[in-house]
Amino acid sequence: MAVIKKGARRKDVKEPKKRSAKIKKATFDANKKKEVGISDLTLLSKISDESINENLKKRFKNGIIYTYIGHVLISVNPFRDLGIYTNAVLESYKGKNRLEVPPHVFAIAESMYYNLKSYNENQCVIISGESGAGKTEAAKRIMQYIAAASNSHSESIGKIKDMVLATNPLLESFGCAKTLRNNNSSRHGKYLEIKFNSQFEPCAGNITNYLLEKQRVVGQIKNERNFHIFYQFTKGASDTYKQMFGVQMPEQYIYTAAAGCTTADTIDDVKDYEGTLEAMRTIGLVQEEQDQIFRMLAAILWIGNISFIENEEGNAQVGDTSVTDFVAYLLQVDASLLVKCLVERIMQTSHGMKRGSVYHVPLNPVQATAVRDALAKAIYNNLFDWIVDRVNVSLQAFPGADKSIGILDIYGFEIFEHNSFEQICINYVNEKLQQIFIQLTLKAEQETYEREKIKWTPIKYFDNKVVCDLIEAKNPPGILAAMNDSIATAHADSNAADQAFAQRLNLFNSNPYFELRANKFVIKHYAGDVTYDINGITDKNKDQLQKDLIELIGTTTNTFLSTIFPDDVDKDSKRRPPTAGDKIIKSANELVETLSKAEPSYIRTIKPNQTKSPNDYDDHQVLHQVKYLGLQENVRIRRAGFAYRQTFEKFVERFYLLSPDCSYAGDYTWDGDTLEAVKLILRDAMIPEKEFQLGVTSVFIKTPESLFALEDMRDKYWYNMAARIQRAWRRFLQRRIDAAIKIQRTIREKKGGNKYVKLRDYGTKLLAGKKERRSMSLLGYRAFMGDYLSCNESKTKGSYIRRQVGIKDKVVFSIKGECLHSKFGRSAQRLKKVFILTKKTFYIIGQTREQNAMKYTQDYKIDVGKIKQVSLTNLQDDWMGVILVNSTQSDPLINTPFKTELMTRLKKLNEKIMIKVGPTIEYHKQPNKLHTVRSKISDSAPKYGDIYKSSTIYVRRGHPANSKSNKKPKNPGGLSGKPIKSKKSKHKSTHKHTHSHRSHRDAAKKQPLPSQKPVNPLSLAATAAQAAYNPKPDKTVPIKSSAIPAAKVSSKHSSKPSSKEKVAVKKASSSHKSSSAKQNQVSMPPSKGVEKNKEPLKETTATATANIPIPPPPPPMGQPKDPKFEAAYDFPGSGSSSELPLKKGDIVFISRDEPSGWSLAKLLDGSKEGWVPTAYMTPYKDTRNTVPVAATGAVNDVTNQKSSQIDNTISSAQEGVQFGSATVGPTSDNQSNPVGTFSDGLASALAARANKMRAESADDDDNDDGDDDDDW
């Protein structure tokens, strides 16, 4: 039969919002790439160099270039644009830890910026790898991310960010060049510090330059290029520059054309020139400064075109003086003095402390060419230093710097066919960086574990400190110190200095990382063995410009040229000036010191091939890099170590919010030992013990997941606190809204009445005195709500049916029911249907199951105006025939528990419809063929239904046709009363799931006591319909009139019975056994899940039971310690293990009564305990105190005479009368007994329940304010 799933709803009642704490709905990520290989090498099943190389190769072939080793990023140069640096990709990494997103350089940048903000510590990233592995690109992407992540609307902050980004194209133009291995190889070292203010916005910056490869200015090996700026300038110079500085194409200059390569495949020099000019303007270089920079570049190019010939004396002579004249014009010096400085060398002798003679020594063409190149290199080197200093001046324009993020972009390890002084300096710096990596990761980590007494298995690794000492040591002297001594010994002759250096190298033969081979020597670097040439190495180490060239520059009238060169040389100074080796050692040590003051991050870059091909992967080359970078040792230490360590003090300062014992409302409240605070934090954050260790001064967290969990909880702390305040405030506002709605509804009902109740009364008048009534239709809460399937709402079953059928009009009435379906030669069938009524149309909707899904189809679409008549029987059945006007289809014969409401609404929509009530229903079974259905009374019919067979309806006797509906009970609390609420649980977890249907279901499984939902007065009609159309299985038991339990009525709702009535009560109660055989069989299932009633007890009219005396409530008696009760009816139970099945007459102990109408009972022998309906139990009385049976004869006679008349009344009333601890008996209108009839029993029982709930709710309301702030 039809099931009412949802009761009537008010428009102002909204579905509760879903709580954000719930698991989000899973969605398919179409953009997520399939995982290739392993994203973190610490997860490798087998740790070896080969397995690492194989994993990197697999990912490289699939376009994935980034892989982790813990927090260290491995980057393989793809030699192509993968489209992974867009703004969309950048945004996806904001606020994410590295486990939430794929490996990426943006993840390293996000981690650095997050740690800067969270721990207020300087950060740096060390990018290492050989030349062409992608170090410069990684540095650019980190700068890109930090500039984007540090959003600020301040104009000054935005200007600084633009300046920082502009340093990339500017310094790349002047410091990078195309080599055989890399089209954009850094030929200098750069450490960029981005400084942040207290709001962690970039406010300043500083660039430190390391060892520019100035030799590249004057010469390159075949197929390499000079610095980018020379090709940009010569190809993209404006006409003004071409006219002022005589700029030609790069093929016209020796310095740019000698190597035979003036173009590169991936480089657009003209476009890059425009980018360089834009970067200059962004940084703040004015036009005059730009002009002077390009004037110096033009001078360098023209200096390279100065050629020398040998004169008659074998000395050098300038081949074309027009070139020297133009160079003198550009440098703004005297042309003759320039030529003299190029072809002659000034030497000065000394005698002790006295100045000696001065000699002008002529130079041969080779020597003159060397002097020319020295002048060009000196101008470019000093120009580059000036540009770096000028950038720093612009970046320091805004004060307020507090912390910084450093980005180290330095030349990679180099091994060429011929390696000289430049390579030994570059490789030395890379050795120092490797030493930092070892000290800060491998060595320092193990030393920390040992110092902190952490359980640890030592890992062997190679410490390259011995190689660094071999190069930089002072005592005993290293290679660079030996080179300085050779220069001091033979400073005038480069060849003699080289020979002296070769002799001193014999001192290192005992070192296992050094080998001497004729005019070469080998250093066994961490990245491999490198052979260096001795010839000319000492001259490069001098790094000195001839004094006559310095004096020449001192005579210039160009203030810019004077600015970029140092002060005049102190001719009287006897102190040896620092060599290039001294400078690089000093710079490297300063760099190490700077990096050691910051929290480091690491990016290890790998070059997959030497051909710069995006498809080639050289296993041998990559495997070599994997070995010398020490990736295997890094993986082993990472797997055995801890992802995070912090001192107790800083850990508590960071995470004390996570422990209620350490904090309150954001304040640190713990005054005990710091170690105890650490333990409390870890305990309250529920970090497993295996995930951390406590050392002597620090706490160690093993996995990144645990650290991220701590960080996530801390980030959400303030959100959770704000959410608590918001929930409390919203709850307060909702109470005010509910109270206002309640007041408004009450006022409206007092002024104009309830429209739903008015409609019910109108329908009752239409059938007044014509049709027997059902018990549920007499309830005071029964109102004609109309849309019982909630078709007008969204996301309901009714709206789903409405959409399937295609109903667009507003639904006036909807209900489930049945329709009689006739078949030729077979009995008619009762098929389930859905009835939907709009203002114009009445729909009868059929349902079928197809492919395990319910499908709804339109059986009837009846125009309300074409309904001629509605035919009903005069009994209490639910059948009605809808007679149509001149219809070509049969008239529907339908069955619905809300037939009266349907008939009433049809009548309201069409006043012409006739209502016919009689012993039969006449309808057209087929067009123009009238068919008659009869109705008969049968005791064998279902209690809440009927039987249809052979055109006859069999139904039980109903209430008299003139029975009146009960009035709607009044609100017991009045306008000032608070809403009745069920007692709130103090436990936090139960409060979280208050509105969850699943949680209710789970709680029902765990809670043995059946619970009841708070009543909604407007939904009682739906509940009545559900009970009417879904009766519980009938189990008939014999019942006597005297066995009806007495009602426990509150004293303020009852009055004392008269003395005559007391006597009648005694007689009626004593007739319990003698009258049992003469009673009918009625069913008494337990009353579960019935809604609460807030209305006071009322009396109703029941003419069939007017003169039957009913026992009043027994007088109150003292409760024994273990009171005995007797089962008045059979209680078979529903099968739940928490219930105690009983048979009539069983005696049990009652230890606990619940307001919901259940009692906890235990057998007399104590063998079993469970819940039973309170209404089924009566106090047990000893037979010695029972009134003699003979005294009750008169009562039995009366009962027997009237039993046939009140049979239906009792059977229907007993289903609804037993609620809570209140039971009532039937009375008539003229009876003085204050106890109500069975038809009024539901209201009476719910009234008693409501009284008790009001008292409980008052206690709840007193404590409710205190619970608000404890709501998580």
UniProtKB/Swiss-Prot annotation:
Domain Myosin motor: 36-715
PTM remark: Phosphorylation of the TEDS site (Ser-357) is required for the polarization of the actin cytoskeleton and for ligand-induced, but not for constitutive internalization of STE2. Phosphorylation probably activates the myosin-I ATPase. Ser-357 is phosphorylated by CLA4 and STE20 in vitro.
Residues the entry annotates as binding ATP: 129-136
SUPFAM superfamilies per UniProt: P-loop containing nucleoside triphosphate hydrolases, SH3-domain
Biased composition (Basic and acidic residues): 1089-1098
Protein's cellular compartments: Cytoplasm, Cytoskeleton, Actin patch
Keyword Phosphoprotein tagged: yes
Acidic residues composition-biased segments: 1258-1272
Stretches assigned to the SH3 domain: 1120-1182
Region ranges (Disordered): 1-20, 951-1015, 1029-1141, 1217-1272
Compositional bias (Low complexity): 1066-1078
Domain IQ: start-end pairs: 719-739, 740-765
Sequence ranges of Pro residues compositional bias: 1109-1118
Predominant location: cytoplasm
GO BP terms, alphabetized: actin cortical patch localization; actin filament organization; bipolar cellular bud site selection; endocytosis; exocytosis; fungal-type cell wall organization; positive regulation of Arp2/3 complex-mediated actin nucleation; response to osmotic stress
Single Gene Ontology MF annotation: microfilament motor activity
Basic residues bias: start-end ranges: 980-1000
Domain TH1 positions: 771-961
Region (Actin-binding): 588-610
Function: One of two redundant type-I myosins implicated in the organization of the actin cytoskeleton. Required for proper actin cytoskeleton polarization and for the internalization step in endocytosis. At the cell cortex, assembles in patch-like structures together with proteins from the actin-polymerizing machinery and promotes actin assembly. Functions redundantly with LAS17 as actin nucleation-promoting factor (NPF) for the Arp2/3 complex. Motor domain phosphorylation by PAK kinases CLA4 and STE20 promotes CDC42-regulated actin assembly.
Free-text note regarding domains: The myosin motor domain displays actin-stimulated ATPase activity and generates a mechanochemical force.
Family: Belongs to the TRAFAC class myosin-kinesin ATPase superfamily. Myosin family.
Note: Present with 155 molecules/cell in log phase SD medium.
Subunit structure, interactors included: Interacts (via myosin motor domain) with SHE4; this interaction is important for proper localization and may regulate the interaction of the motor domain with actin. Interacts (via SH3 domain) with VRP1; this interaction is required for localization to sites of polarized growth and may regulate the interaction of the tail domain with actin. Interacts (via SH3 domain) with PAN1; this interaction is important for late stages of endocytopsis. Interacts (via SH3 domain) with BBC1 and LAS17. Interacts (via C-terminal acidic tail) with ARC19 and ARC40; ARC19 and ARC40 are Arp2/3 complex subunits.
Name of this chain's protein: Myosin-3
The organism of origin for this protein: Saccharomyces cerevisiae (strain ATCC 204508 / S288c)
